[in-house]
């Protein structure tokens, strides 16, 4: 079966579905790392964040794609130890899909919308407006590279995003 488009899961329509105790076979999250770069260095003077502007659900595949993109841009521009990046959301929400049979004779096999609760197909993170998704800490000279990396990460997410400077705004003006 093909993966459904993200627009099917983007909007928050029903109440949260997170109790894995009662679900059989929840697929694991594809997000592997939540902290990247120089984890020991806490003295980076500039911190910038990627903020979502609308309430939505972000699939774990989109979070992983955004993380990989931002990490690749930062490593290429600042080096492996020139930044610290943190992914600040976790995909708790379990996404379901009511599989539909297609093709010849599907009407005999399929039950349509009867028992349409669906099977678990993935996980997603529910975010609120103005919630931080990624935070990047860098040196002053690497500010533009970090901003560009967050912009590229925002392009992978299903909601409009904005980049804000958390610390060190006076250094980068």
Curated annotation (Swiss-Prot):
Organism: Methanosarcina acetivorans (strain ATCC 35395 / DSM 2834 / JCM 12185 / C2A)
CDD domains: Ribosomal_L16_L10e
HAMAP family: Ribosomal_uL16_arch (MF_00448)
Matching InterPro entries: Ribosomal_uL16 (IPR047873), Ribosomal_uL16_arc (IPR022981), Ribosomal_uL16_CS_euk_arc (IPR018255), Ribosomal_uL16_dom (IPR016180), Ribosomal_uL16_euk_arch (IPR001197), Ribosomal_uL16_sf (IPR036920)
Gene3D superfamilies attached to this UniProt entry: Ribosomal protein L10e/L16
Record keyword Ribonucleoprotein present: yes
Keywords: Ribonucleoprotein, Ribosomal protein
Protein name: Large ribosomal subunit protein uL16
Gene Ontology cellular component list: cytosolic large ribosomal subunit
Taxonomic classification: Archaea, Methanobacteriati, Methanobacteriota, Stenosarchaea group, Methanomicrobia
GO molecular function: structural constituent of ribosome
GO biological-process terms attached to the record: translation
The family this protein is said to belong to: Belongs to the universal ribosomal protein uL16 family.
